[in-house]
Amino acid sequence: MSLISKPGKYLRMYAGMLMRRDPGLIVFGAWLGERFADNSKELFLEAQAREGIRAVWVAKEQAVIDEINSLGFEAYLWGSPEARSIQQRAGYAVISNGISDLEHTYLGGAVILDLWHGVPLKKICYDDRYEKNWDSPKQKIRDFLINIPLGKEYYVATSQTFVPIYQSCFRKNPDHILCLGQPRNDLFFRERPEPYYPGKRVIL
C-alpha cells in the first residue's frame, strides 16, 4: 500500500464513524474474503431465519457470491459499489479470522463480532512474538489509529478458561471478550438437527 493511499484508508475509517449505521443490517465475511465457511457462515445462515435482520455476505471470489446467491441469499463482490455501501451502513460486522475478512476501511463505527475459528492452542496475534514486533513505534501508531474507528470489536471465547488468553493475545479488556460458543458447533446441540449435509449423517 502506498504512502498516499494509507492516509485515505484511515480517513475513510474515521468518516465511517460519522455515518448512520443500521442495527438491522449485518455484513458477514470469512477467511480474508475468500470463502463461505466457518463460524461466520453458520451465523449467517441462522440470521436468515430471523425477522428484522438483513444479513449480507461480502467475498472476493465470484464463485462464492454465486454459491450464496444460489441459496437465495444476498451477497456482493468485494470492492463493488454494493459491497462498500453495505459495509458503510451495516450496524454490525461478523468475521471469523480478523478484520481483513471484510473491507475494514469501511467499517468505522460498526460493532465488529469476531467469532474466531478455533481455540488458542498456540501463541497467536500479540502473544506471538515471532510474527512481528508488536511493540515497535510503527505498530503502536498503527494500532492507535485503527482502534479508534474499529474499537467496538468483540471476540467470542468458548469458555471462561480462554477468556484471559483472549485478553492477552488480542489485547482487549474483559468486557470485549464474550464467553459464548461457536456457531458451527450448535449443530450438535439441537434436539432435531436439520440435515446439514443432505444424504449424510454427522457423527463427529
PLM feature segments, named:
Residues 61, 97, 158-161:
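Helix N-cap/beta->alpha junction signal
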Residues 56, 76, 94, 111-114, ...:
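Hydrophobic/aromatic beta-strand patches that form the interior of the parallel beta-sheet core
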Residues 64-65, 81-88, 185-187:
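A short acidic, often aromatic-flanked loop/helix-cap motif at beta-alpha or helix-coil junctions
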Residues 1-82:
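N-terminal pre-catalytic "stem/leader" segment of glycosyltransferase-like enzymes
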Residues 23-24, 110, 200-203:
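Nucleotide donor/acceptor-binding cores
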Residues 41-45, 72-137:
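Extended catalytic core of nucleotide-activated donor transferases of GT-like folds
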Residues 37-40, 66-70, 104-106, 125, ...:
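A short acidic (Asp/Glu
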Residues 2-12, 121-204:
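A nucleotide-sugar donor-handling region in carbohydrate enzymes
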